Amino acid sequence: MIASTGKTNLLGLTQQEMEKFFDSIGEKRFRAGQVMKWIHHFGVDDFDAMTNVSKALREKLKACAEVRGPEVVSEDISSDGTRKWVVRVESGSCVETVYIPQGKRGTLCVSSQAGCALDCSFCSTGKQGFNSNLTAAEVIGQVWIANKSFGSVPATVDRAITNVVMMGMGEPLLNFDNVIAAMHLMMDDLGYGISKRRVTLSTSGVVPMIDELSKHIDVSLALSLHAPNDALRNQLVPINKKYPLQMLLDSCRRYMSSLGEKRVLTIEYTMLKDINDKVEHAVEMIELLKDTPCKINLIPFNPFPHSGYERPSNNAIRRFQDLLHQAGYNVTVRTTRGEDIDAACGQLVGQVMDRTRRSERYIAVRELSAEAETAPVAATRT
């Protein structure tokens, strides 16, 4: 457990919250913008370094506030440029953040919880159970740490991080308020100024919160599907028993429609040998998604000890992909990145106890992040 200082952590405050904070200490609201730029654009955590802030205000801030991100436990860099950070949060648990570069694009995969309560059968985090929600500061702190690590400050100039995906450890919609606040900071010009099309939230299917999402934010949405029928999905993703497929897809369509633009849902589908990789599964998937504008990301499973699952053959994956292509869907197969630093999916057993095993996580979310700039709407199933 990391000891709390009792001070207000400014790192996770949205612009509105920051303005209220300055009101509360008797200062002008414009100070909020000044301080936010120092924190997020320049990566500053020392009030004395904020040179356009008066000395009196700096002293006041030091007495009642702080800028504190998660503690970096380790940082590793792969031969392919993938980076992985293990960070410790206030609860004492460790979570992971992974950066995947590709050309001019750099995607950061961010965690939202330590542990997970959803108990997906191919996910070791689910077997470990839920530990804690990350605070807004701990969620946005992963972006802050990565940005500082690259030395890409100010954040709006020659940025290394062009896309963020909430696909790390945990179910983002079960930490709704903190994740929403952090995503607002990702997109705010006083934060990281990332386009709404380049911020993606991935969910296993918490239907009420999908319906709530459009009232609070406009970001891209990805659905962890993993099965084309309720019977199989009930086994793989138990939350499906509460929110079955048609209910779930209806909520996703409502959300996408609410955006008022030609946006498509990303479908994530972890491929498990002899479980969900057969021709009949592809046929079911084609029928299931016929009314859902979407692109599909097939994710070959990376086995881990005692998982009970195996990766399908390349032929089985290609056959599945071809069937979906022939039906008119835009389909990609995830490419594994960062294996030499154990940043590839399923490679971190024993290093961090509370880590995700959702097999779609961490790497090769590059396909997702490319949607806005490389996937024309005409190439998607409508």
From Swiss-Prot:
GO terms for molecular function: 4 iron, 4 sulfur cluster binding; metal ion binding; rRNA (adenine(2503)-C2-)-methyltransferase activity; rRNA binding; tRNA (adenine(37)-C2)-methyltransferase activity; tRNA binding. It comes from Pseudomonas savastanoi pv. phaseolicola (strain 1448A / Race 6) (Pseudomonas syringae pv. phaseolicola (strain 1448A / Race 6)). [4Fe-4S] cluster binds at residues 116, 120, 123. Reaction proceeds by a ping-pong mechanism involving intermediate methylation of a conserved cysteine residue. The gene is rlmN. This is Dual-specificity RNA methyltransferase RlmN. Residues 102-342 form the Radical SAM core domain. Belongs to the radical SAM superfamily. RlmN family. It catalyses: adenosine(2503) in 23S rRNA + 2 reduced [2Fe-2S]-[ferredoxin] + 2 S-adenosyl-L-methionine = 2-methyladenosine(2503) in 23S rRNA + 5'-deoxyadenosine + L-methionine + 2 oxidized [2Fe-2S]-[ferredoxin] + S-adenosyl-L-homocysteine; adenosine(37) in tRNA + 2 reduced [2Fe-2S]-[ferredoxin] + 2 S-adenosyl-L-methionine = 2-methyladenosine(37) in tRNA + 5'-deoxyadenosine + L-methionine + 2 oxidized [2Fe-2S]-[ferredoxin] + S-adenosyl-L-homocysteine. Keywords: 4Fe-4S, Cytoplasm, Disulfide bond, Iron, Iron-sulfur, Metal-binding, Methyltransferase, rRNA processing, S-adenosyl-L-methionine, Transferase, tRNA processing. It is found in: Cytoplasm. Signal peptide: none annotated. CDD domains: Radical_SAM.
